[in-house]
Swiss-Prot record:
One of its GO terms (molecular function) is DNA-binding transcription activator activity, RNA polymerase II-specific. The gene is TFCP2. Residues 238-268, 294-325 are annotated as: Disordered. Residues 241-265 have a biased composition (Basic and acidic residues). This is Alpha-globin transcription factor CP2. Binds to DNA as a dimer, isoform 3 does not bind to DNA or affect the binding of isoform 1 to DNA. Interacts with UBP1 and PIAS1, and is probably part of a complex containing TFCP2, UBP1 and PIAS1. Component of the SSP (stage selector protein) complex, which appears to be a heteromer of TFCP2 and 2 copies of NFE4.
């Protein structure tokens, strides 16, 4: 017997009405209902939904970092949502940075009861200034003799051990500390942001800096070289009390904005949390520029005295290479990715050795990393250097060189084939990117291990032996791979020299 459930008449009427209402509510989906109708795509495109979507952290942001560094200074309220925070500091004022241990139970047990080493740096935020950091810091050193860019306020600091400030690294300090104990370090930044701007008409904006902290643990040999954690934040430094005035100005500007405009900006926080970043590379540049302060050997400038041999000239420092090799282990490959600013892809390439990475084609890395980072990674893997804008060759003139040149001229009169006594002269290549007289001065000074301040002027020997002052425009008109002999004259007023390109 089949059983059928029969609804009363009233229930059947209700059910029929509900079905009709539901059908009616669905009938308009996907159709244009009129000028005032909303489409679902328009609704999802509203800023509120976009913000909620972008605020969802990716998987790698959910991880708890082993350490956290907190700068006790308020962030600016004039920073837009999703932009990095910006913090204003006063020149020479002591600011506390709290060193916090965030490790979970059982995480990094090898540092329990041991010290770690943290290195603090003040570096440039702008990529353009990062490329010329050596020149910028050297210029600051000569304008502010005896001063440092970064210092530790030792009396106010707590829990730091063996603080050090290398006299040749003006922007770096370091110390040891125990993660299990309370540690706070007070730092002072002595340079201001406007010292590195192009002076034009006054009132210029200052360049932003970065405070970066790199922490290392001890290796088997007792050296603190194994990287644990790195974090940084963006700052601007003002003259005393200037940061307070700037913070007040930003706050007043925000108060004048409408509630809708305020939603586009971050609130001001009482402290600044340093965010995770790539470790600072041990070797910053791939050209011959030494790291600020590490080249402390200033040999005497013997160019003009005629006592140097053309066959025994000062050797420039060897070019720095950081190429990935097929024999590189997966662990070394991870370190290479960090050093070359590919930290975001270390998880993707966890098990890749050097040989695995080098086998990737251009299309492979672009598909994995995206067009911008993919091309950058491919060029880094292949060790491709950027071709300099101008290459010139220089040779140091000396008394022996003059004598040999005279001998060659005499022998050439006897031997028309030009085959003289077989001597040859060593030239050094100078690679120029900015094509300026300042850059040429620095390159020549670096080549002969002297200070740029010891070079007063650079001249080019012109027709009839006249001395033409080198300018930016003249350098821009140098021929590629032009050869010059360097001669010198003692300056009249001080211990510097004039360089003559022949």
């Amino acid at each position: 017997m089949a059983w059928a459930l029969k609804l009363p008449l009233a229930d059947e009427v209700i059910e029929s009405g509900l079905v009709q209402d539901f059908d009616a509510s669905l009938s308009g989906i996907g159709q244009e209902l009129g000028a005032g109708a909303y489409s679902m795509s328009d609704v999802l495109a509203l800023p509120i939904f976009k913000q909620e979507e972008s605020s969802l952290p990716p998987d790698n942001e959910n991880k708890i970092l082993p350490f956290q560094y907190v700068l006790c200074a308020a962030t600016s309220p004039a920073v837009k949502l999703h932009d990095e925070t910006l913090t204003y500091l006063n020149q020479g004022q002591s600011y506390e940075i709290r060193m916090l241990d965030n490790r979970k139970l059982g995480e990094l047990p090898e540092i329990n009861g041991k010290l770690v080493k943290s290195i603090f740096r003040v570096v440039f935020h702008d990529r353009r200034l990062q490329y010329t950091e050596h020149q910028q810091l050297e210029g600051w050193r000569w304008n502010r003799p005896g001063d440092r860019i970064l210092d530790i306020d030792i009396p106010m600091s707590v829990g730091i051990i063996d603080p050090r400030a290398n006299p040749t690294q003006l922007n770096t300090v370091e110390f040891l500390w125990d993660p299990a104990k309370r540690t706070s370090v007070f730092i002072q930044v002595h340079c201001i942001s406007t010292e590195f701007t192009m002076r034009k008409h006054g009132g210029e904006k200052g360049v932003p800096f970065r405070v970066q902290i790199d922490t290392f643990k001890e290796n088997e040999n007792g050296e603190y070289t194994e990287h644990l954690h790195s974090a940084s934040c963006q700052i601007k430094v003002f003259k005393p009390k200037g940061a307070d005035r700037k913070q007040k100005t930003d706050r007043e500007k925000m108060e004048k904005r409408t509630p809708h405009e305020k939603e586009k900006y971050q609130p001001s926080y009482e402290t600044t949390i340093l965010t995770e970043c790539s470790p600072w590379p041990e070797i910053t540049y791939v050209n011959n520029s030494p790291s600020p302060g590490f080249n402390s050997s200033h040999s005497s400038f013997s160019l003009g005295e005629g006592n140097g041999s053309p066959n025994h000239q000062p050797e420039p420092p060897p070019p720095v290479t950081d190429n990935l090799l097929p024999t590189t282990t997966p662990q070394e490959a991870q370190q290479w990715l960090h050093r070359n600013r590919f930290s975001t892809f270390t998880r993707l390439f966890t098990n890749f050795s050097g040989a695995d990475l080098l086998k990737l084609t251009r299309d492979d890395v672009i598909q994995i990393c995206g067009p911008a980072d993919g091309i950058r990674l491919f060029n880094a893997l292949k060790g491709r250097m950027v071709r300099p804008r101008l290459t010139i060759y220089v040779c140091q003139e000396s008394l022996q060189l003059r004598e040999q040149q005279q001998q060659q001229q005499q022998q050439q009169q006897k031997h028309e084939d030009g085959d003289s006594n077989g001597t040859f002269f060593v030239y050094h290549a100078i690679y120029l990117e900015e094509l300026t007289a300042v850059e040429l001065t620095e390159k020549i000074a670096q080549l002969f291990s002297i200070s740029p301040c010891q070079i007063s002027q650079i001249y080019k020997q012109g027709p009839t032996g006249i001395h033409v002052l080198i300018s930016d425009e003249m350098i821009q008109n140098f021929q590629e791979e032009a050869c010059f002999i360097l001669d010198t004259m003692k300056a009249e007023t001080n211990d510097s020299y004039h360089i003559i390109l022949k």
